[in-house]
Amino acid sequence: MAPSTRTFVGLDIGTTKISCIVADQNGGGELRIVGIGNAPSEGLRRGVVVDLEKTVASIQRAVDEAERMAGIPIKGVSAGIAGDHIRSINSRGVIAVSRKDNEIGPADVERVIEAAKAIAIPMDREIIHVIPQEFIVDDQDGIKDPVGMSGVRLEAEVHIITGAVTSAKNICRAIQRAGLKVYDLVLEPLASSHAVLGPDERDLGVALLDLGGGTTDVAVFFEGSIRHTAIVPFGGANVTNDIAIGLRTPIDKAEAIKIQYGAALAALVSHTESLTVNGVGGRSDRQISRHLLASMIEPRMEEIFVLANKEVKKNHFVEMLGGGVVLTGGTSLMPGVVELAEQVFEMPVRLGAPQGLGGLSANVADPRFSTGVGLVLHAARADVGEELFRDRRSAGERKAGFDLRRWFSDLF
């Protein structure tokens, strides 16, 4: 590999699968997917580690597969984090500009963001991201970059995302036990937004729903900035469980039935279509209609969308969504999902998948890989100082790896 080539690795640690995406970037800035690894996820529930050793083994399988395909060793990753422990809040900071000539410098921007971060956070929680939404200079709002402007008073409106310390700590430990450095932790819907949303959608207003196995992650964008994030504690695994109970069949059989025959909107499925459900415990096989299967799936999918819509409606965000709703994640591939979402949200809905990359990009042009590809894109932008999200570490600290003892030092 040429010396001028940079390598970036995204690790999507999901409830049902783990994906490792490897990309390289040449001197011209073009990103090419060069390695992909997937493994069934074991040891996690709703994005939270419940069995460390099983999680480590799953990570190793996905990373080993990606390494073999890419032909290079993987030393560290940008990892996704999700789960119903995630919380978010909007905050504002205010400072007086420090220079005598009233010119705003980078140090002023850092100070005002630190002021905005000065909120009461429980000891068992940690800041994951601090995302500037806009700056206000002497009551002039809507400013994206105030450096070089003149003013006496500088304000910043930021979006702060926090997570449970133990949950973040266990994700990091699992990755490190797999022999890898953690260069960055990125909230999964924010990573996915890199891969599936365009600048126009972010400006116009859009809600992104990442329909995963254990959770559904919600992110609302307006005027180019993140305005709200939330986690709905239901996903594709709940649909599978509903099918298993309704058809009295094992989870693995229910998952296969969901993938092959599932539909989220019963009205779109003919009553005449049928499928075979394998008998268990010596019972004979039986035939059911696909419409009956869809009628088992639809209530859960509707519940997910209703809960997500409640989040979107908070603080009247729904009035800002000129770009409608974008669905991504593995569960979004189910037939009828877009149509059902349009009924619940009462606005245009589209499916989002990663686009515009080189190399093996055709292999990841699928909603299931949005988070993994988004993590790679985030890492590439952070490498040149273009990241959209801030955390507690400098670029140098990020490249050196995630220091658990330092990040969680407040607890000890």
Q: What do these predicted ranges mean?
A:
Residues 222:
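A cytosolic small-molecule/anion-sensing beta-strand core signal
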Residues 1-15, 21-208, 225-226, 236, ...:
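Nucleotide/phosphate-binding catalytic cleft detector across ATP-hydrolyzing
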Residues 306, 310-324, 334-351, 380-385:
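ATP-binding/phosphotransfer module of carbohydrate and carboxylate kinases, centering on a glycine-rich
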Residues 218-219:
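A structural feature that tracks compact, well-ordered secondary-structure segments
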Residues 308, 327, 375:
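Hydrophobic, well-ordered secondary-structure elements that form the walls
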